[in-house]
Amino acid sequence: MFFSINSFSHEEGANFSGAIIDPLRVHHAHIEDEQRINFSFIDDVGNIDGNNTYSHSLELAINWDDNFRWGSEIFIPYSNTGRSGADIGDIDIQLIKYAFINEPETILTGIFGMSLPTGNKSKGLGGENTAIEAALFLDKAYKNWYWGLNLELGTVVSGENETEFELATAVSYSFIDGTTDLASPKPQQNFVPSVSFELVSENILSGAEKGTNVVTVIPGLHLWHSKSDWSIRFGVEIPVSSDKENDRVYLLQIGTHKDWGGIFN
């Protein structure tokens, strides 16, 4: 099983629609400073020893300019999904994030990133592969509705041969009072609940596992405290394809969009 909680809002000065959420698995397109912890509790396929399996991560993002158009992001995983014990896994870095379209209700962002072999190989939590990825992320809001789309292509450039394509989409509805046109970036109500549904398809195009296609759905519940800019999110990742990595994954994410300058100054 996989379980996740997430916390989110928008950074001070960002005028994005309040209906634009940070989905559980789908990557959001809007670029902001972000601090988030992701917890994942996994029900493994074929797990017969009864051990609790988890895969958590620290997610940090930075906005490089006042227009929220350039940014970078890093994902640092920590799990016990290997052969023995828990440790850091392979780190993912989105080196360049650029928003080609950067409007309150529509954001289209291009990504160039890398996956680095930082994991503990002896514990089965990493390998010798260095991979690069290119992606397009879309956020689209209409009143209290949100739609997100990801197109990602990743390939190993050092190590075992493998190329993967991911298609992911999310839809959500946020219960923001008084919305007639643009959902307020800073609603007057203390708490904003949202319900979401995500669909993720991961296809291995080349390599030892060529032809593998893992499809999962993720229903989710989000709660945003708009006054503090903190938010929490829960979801369950459920496989719907014959190929699957886990029986269930329970997700819990907690996070915020605090300006890094305000944190360190």
PLM feature spans:
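N-terminal signal peptide c-region/cleavage motif recognized by signal peptidases
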Residues: 4-6
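Transmembrane beta-barrel domains of Gram-negative outer membranes and organellar outer membranes
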Residues: 8-158, 162-265
